[in-house]
Amino acid sequence: MRQKPKSPARVPAAGQKPSIEEAFQLRFTPDAAADIQSLHGSIRDQLRKVLEKKLAVNPEGYGLPLRGALANFWKHEFGNHRVIYRIYPQLRVVAICSVGIRKQGDAADIYRQLESVAKSGRLAEQLASVLKKILPET
């Protein structure tokens, strides 16, 4: 069951892009960038559409929140693939953390892999690096 967005978001009319002020910036962790490079071209095209038309417009409305070790992260499903991301609403940023296939019970499962990266501290480091690039220096 999909959760409704916490704050109302104006969704552009069909074929219309959100204005720069309304759209979320999409940022990628190094691991997510590597995940995307490893995808087949047609899957990358599908992913690009998901990112531009859905997650950049209304990431809460098109995603589902995760629980457990990945609480505060969201997922969007397309085919057998998942995009795992974190939303920073005050910054209007969606940080893409991982892209991969759901293989329940398999060590290659996207959720198991991301939990492992999170437990190691590498995910926090990568997110901090992504945010550091967009935050003004103080």
Show the residue positions of the predicted features.
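Short acidic loop-to-beta-strand element that houses the catalytic metal-binding Asp/Glu
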Residues: 82-84
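Enriched for short, Lys/Arg-rich terminal
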Residues: 1-13, 19, 86-138
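A generic structural signal for beta-strand entry/edge sites
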Residues: 23, 73, 91-93
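N-terminal "first-domain core" detector
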Residues: 2-39, 43
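Negatively charged, low-complexity tracts enriched in Asp/Glu with abundant Ser/Thr
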Residues: 38-54
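A short, surface-exposed loop/turn module that caps and links secondary-structure elements
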Residues: 52-77
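A generic beta-sheet turn/junction motif
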Residues: 78-80, 89
